[in-house]
Amino acid sequence: MSAENESPGLPNGGACCASATGHFLLVGNKVTVVLGAQWGDEGKGKVVDLLAQDADIVCRCQGGNNAGHTVVVDSVEYDFHLLPSGIINQNAIAFIGNGVVIHLPGLFEEAEKNLKKGQGLAGWEKRLCISDRAHIVFDFHQAADGIQEQQRQEQAGKNLGTTKKGIGPVYSSKAARSGLRMCDLVSDFNEFSQRFKLLAKQYKSMYPSLEIDIDGELKKLQDYADRVKPMVKDGVYYIYEALHGPPKKILVEGANAALLDIDFGTYPFVTSSNCTVGGVCTGLGIPPQSIGDVYGVVKAYTTRVGIGAFPTEQNNDIGEMLQTRGHEYGVTTGRKRRCGWLDLVLLRYAHMINGFTALALTKLDILDVFSEIKVGVSYKIDGKNIPHFPANQEVLNKVEVEYETLPGWNKDTSNVRTFEELPENAKKYVQFIKEELGIPIKWIGVGKSRESMIQLF
């Protein structure tokens, strides 16, 4: 490329094109996004794993090690909380964006645990890139999380059911402008130490029972700073170059899910970040036009961990059966998940916010034993249909769900590998969901392994 043709100020001479109005628009690679469409645990890890096989960069854009993704490769089950699960692709770069909050002991512990399981993580430190603008979770954030939960329990008789990973407190520090970022850790350590001491002091005054070994913590952080320094990059420029350089496949794996979003979820029983599509732009520093496909991951029924409204919940044999057959325990907390029928009101709402281009319907095989299957299609309050998903939790707790009953298929689908092989009623169930939501279904999951994802188009 000659010097005259190079776009000024664009890394790699990124291409431009003129619009009809004469303004210059950037064109580049698009990112593919995978998001949870319910309350988490939908099987996002499996969809990401499928797409990550030929990805060049796999990103996390929000949340911390409160997320839990399980990926099975060559019969080895890897658990990811903070690391993008695409890190098991030896040819991809795993990128942790500025919207993610990082607990350094948790990061290294997670990598070491997975290294012991199999070869998937070999050489991970060379494949991980961390935004210098990402905030750091300290041990006292985690301790404060536990104290806050205890206080909620004592004062209100119920807590939020957080993972006690310090996520809420660190996002609070970020919003209060007292947090510390990766760029602070790897720059002047004396300056970092002063700010760390000040933040620790603030936490001590808020929570007098908090014990913080400041010198011990700083010594550990100094060690982490040395280990992590080669991985820390200016995330904005890194992602910009990836978008506007040579063709690349860039994948974003969302953590948590739409109904756990701080703005759009079932507040206050939500996480502390935006886990809808807007969080991808703010958590990576990319413009909306760089977003390509947005895949929503939907479990064939609904689950929720912890407390909060759950209109289609089944506190009965059906819920028990779903729980047992689906092995519904949280990856991060080990807590039993609450189970219920699929809720289309909730999914329409998630689609309004995220604009899914296609869905992955997972765990269809869990429904194999039911003679009839119900699907929540609308909500009523005092006998009147409500046209929207209520923001207020008390209102959501009161809704009556209108169900559509579909016939079950009573056949094992776990070895099915094409849509045509599915039992007739299973096809009808998938078709019903697709038509009601108006979103194409691209994958159907009928088991744990990578091979058990049936691709439709």
Curated annotation (Swiss-Prot):
GO terms for molecular function: adenylosuccinate synthase activity; GTP binding; magnesium ion binding. Its cofactor is Mg(2+). Mg(2+) binds at D41, G68. InterPro entries: Adenylosuccin_syn_GTP-bd, Adenylosuccin_syn_Lys_AS, Adenylosuccinate_synth_dom1, Adenylosuccinate_synth_dom2, Adenylosuccinate_synth_dom3, Adenylosuccinate_synthetase, AdSS_2_vert, P-loop_NTPase. Inhibited competitively by AMP and IMP and non-competitively by fructose 1,6-bisphosphate. The keyword Transferase does not apply. Its EC number is 6.3.4.4. Pathway: Purine metabolism; AMP biosynthesis via de novo pathway; AMP from IMP: step 1/2. GTP binds at residues 40-46, 68-70, 337, 363-365, 445-448. The active site is at D41 (proton acceptor), H69 (proton donor). The keyword Cytoplasm applies. Substrate binds at D41, V331, T332, T333, G334, R335, K336, R337. Keywords: Cytoplasm, GTP-binding, Ligase, Magnesium, Metal-binding, Mitochondrion, Nucleotide-binding, Purine biosynthesis. HAMAP family: Adenylosucc_synth, Adenylosucc_synth_vert_acid. Belongs to the adenylosuccinate synthetase family. Plays an important role in the de novo pathway and in the salvage pathway of purine nucleotide biosynthesis. Catalyzes the first committed step in the biosynthesis of AMP from IMP. This is Adenylosuccinate synthetase isozyme 2. It comes from Xenopus laevis (African clawed frog). The gene is adss2.
